[in-house]
């Protein structure tokens, strides 16, 4: 809409965030601007819980899941690696049998995040309007990606990348 276009033209990152970032705070001057941290909140929470288990309680074997974002360390009680199953996005679309991909959590990474546009959408005729908003346009994403899975050391980082990938086109991610 024209209101979204006006806001997009008049607001930059520097206009939104003010202050000294060394004090670990952000400040916004314009009341119309809203900040949301949905893109990393669940992953960050999983990281904080995992760090608490590890560094505060001395627990070295755990798996933490917060809203689908996972952080794991060590092994299961049977000394086997943690195994995470990821639903194939086409399962939701075609009403077929659940297809699962299995990911072994090992020493190469400790976190996994999955983001997708195959569950939260509105169908208007032949057009699908997804829940991911492209900050470049202020409109629902027009991505050709159905789901993104990211494996890394920190769930917050995996969560951020998976969310970002869902508004990008495949050609932008893998040139």
Question: What is each of the regions a protein language model found here?
Answer:
Residues 1-175:
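Mature catalytic core of soluble alpha/beta enzymes
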